[in-house]
Each structure stands twice: as structure tokens, then as C-alpha cells.
């Protein structure tokens, strides 16, 4: 099935023949729906920490920062901004020249409010010999948009979100990436005054990110009295997945070559595994606000990090107690209670185990990576969110699931999905080392049965694409997971350019 040229390509990517066989088998058998027992809620698995109870967690985080620990902000930033400008691309190709719909009118009515206005105005003067007001007065709206999106101007249609100017300040404007530098200084500064930030970027944009970091880091170091250590990585070619045709055979392009596609954000578990850190914050690049709105974000980042290190301290004490061999029956009961009630890890079979077997079970469940995930109350339709799911070993635990992982044709499961009270804003803090200070090998904790298949096309032919288990979904399936309610004001993603006009981005 594979020829010499194919094998060369596999070797170059670092993909084995066995992986190809496994991936093709996934197309044949598909992925099973996950068995869920309920959507997580405030009554079941989501912690609510009222204002008067936040201080101990914030203090716990501050105490942890004072130790000699490595804290890293991990920011997935490879996404292209092209989808942000979908409406403007449609305007460019429309058979009318002036704004017609509400989106187009809003964009032009409030164009001066965008942080990129001055840069766009300069591009228009250079390329059209007229400024934006003059072009609008002449009805040349499309000239303004093409200077925003195309390479002759700001080229925003081809750049990643991290490099776009998001927010205006009295003397300057900041990109989304710069907002990450500012935010990091506010809650992730270690005892030596260092802030470590790791961006995952696409190979074609890495140099642009590095240039921006080189140009701007000094300003933020001075402003926040910190030292930054900024690093970058790209998705590994070994995480690309093979495309299949409709008969589940390897898809070949018109030149007869195998077609590989990026495996989605789940591939980043490899990048996260390469980060040497005790605690890692994970948040998407576009979920940022200007300094005037950062207070709530910073408070809740410290709160969820405080929950993480407080729980980790207890887990480590229990694991050290187990290793000592000096524990009583009461202490075994205490540990199983902690596992079931605090970590929401339950297995009915544990009632049948003797203490010696129970200890092995407790140790295996406690000695895993730990994450605390912010969850926001649903305001719109239910989407990806927190559930209680059944794991392969029969244990029920907290998981973040996408709708595609749930059998919505089953009325019972559909009802659970629709009763979801919270959604996943991608706001995680993770502990990556065990009680002996050794790094967990994160790929060991991925549930490979949680990928999914999507349908795409290439050269006018349909193909099947394989998405790896999502980074915060199946890629972290076998972690200990805690959900904490965080306020909606901590969730301000920029999905369209006009989102930048919302109050929290002004």
C-alpha cells in the first residue's frame, strides 16, 4: 500500500507505518460516543467560590509564587485571523460597493474605534493617496477593506490573531500578543521577577512573532518591572494525520502523493509536554482585554491557580503517606473520600476492594497530572462544556466534551447536553509534575478513542480528515480535573473583527 516515496515522506515527518495503520483503522471504525452520566453543574462538580472565600486561594497562589517554581503561560497562537474577516471578504466580493448589511455598516460607522485605525489610515494614504475619510466620502469603501486585508496594506487577512492590533491606549496600540505579556506580569511572575510565556505558532509566522517580541519586550519589562522569557514552538509534523478517501484508503493528491493534514489543537499536547514547568496556564490568544478590564481576569487566574496548588499539596501528602506504608484504615477512608468528593473520581467497584487493593487504586488515581478549569455560565446555546463521563476503567470523572462526542440522537443524552449550565472558555491551569518532582509524560494520559472525523475536499475531491483528541478534551482525558465557576467577564474572545468594538475591547 505504501511505496518508497511514501516511506520517505513518513520518515521526514517522524510518523511510523504503524501510526498510519492505526489512523486508517479510525476511518473504518469511527470513534465511539462517550458515555455520560450528567452535565456538570454547581450541585455536581463545579466549585463556586464567592468573593469572601477567594482570599485564601489567592494567598496560596502568592505563597507558591514565592517558592523556587517555574510558572509558564502556554498560549495557542497559530490560528489564522482570516475567519475573523469573513464578513469583510464577502463585502469585497459582493456586487455592491457601499455597506449594505448591519455588520458592514457597523464596521464603517465605528472604524475610528479600531486600534488598527491609524496604521490602516497610513496604508490608505500610501497606496490610494487618500486617507480613510476621503475614501469613504468618495464611496471607495472596498479600497479601505483591501488595504486592511491584503498584502499591499496591513495584510491582516493572512496574519495570525496574535499579531493584530487589538486595543487602543492613550499613546499606543497593543497587539493580542502584547496583551499576553501584560497579563503574564500580573499573575505569573516568579520569585525572581521572571515571566515565562510560550506561544505555539505556525512555521510561516514564527519570524514575525520573534520580531514583535524583540521590538516590544523591553517596553513591558520596564513598565511591569519584570524579565520576560518568551519561547515559541510549532506543531510537530509527527502529529499530522493522514487523509483518507471515501473508501477509507490513503488519499493521494493529483501527483500521487499522500496527503497529511494538521491534527488540530490536540497536537499541542506534544508541545505542552516539552514545556519544563511546575504550573502552566493555558488560554487562547484571542481571549484578552485591555488593562482597564483585566482586574477580574487576574483575580480569577489567581483563584483557580490557588485551588490547583492547594489540592496538589493534599495529593502529594497522601502519596507520600502511601509510600511510607504507615497509614491507618481511617486514613484510607479519608483518601477515598477526598478522591470521590473533592476530585469527583468515583468507581462503584471500590466498595468491593480490600485496603491493600484500594491503596493501589487510590495511588493510581492521585498520581496523575492535575488541572483546574474555569467554567462560565451558559448564556447562549450549549456547546463544548463540562460533563461527568464514564472512563474505560468504569470510573466516572469530570471531562470537557464537545457536542460531537455525545450521542445527541439518544434522547437521554440530548437532554443531559441541553441541561448544561456552563461552557468551557478554555481557561486552564495545569500541574505537570508528580510528588517526586518528576515530569509526567503527558501523551500517556490521552484517550486515543476521542478524536473525530471531519469531511473536507482537495482538488475538487472529497476526503476524510482525522482530528486528534482535543487539547482540553481527550488529550487530557486521564487527568484529575476540577471545575471552578468564573465570571463571564473573564471570557472575551475575538471571533469577528467587530467583536473589537465591544465595550470590553475598547
Question: Where in the sequence are the language-model features?
Answer:
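Long, compositionally biased intrinsically disordered regions
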Residues: 2-42, 353, 357-367, 371-373, ...
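Domain-scale recognition of functional cores that engage charged ligands
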Residues: 10, 14, 29, 36-379, ...
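Conserved catalytic alpha/beta cores of large enzymes that bind or transform nucleotide phosphates
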Residues: 131-138, 152, 156, 286, ...
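Long insertion/accessory domains within large nucleic-acid-processing enzymes
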Residues: 410-411, 433
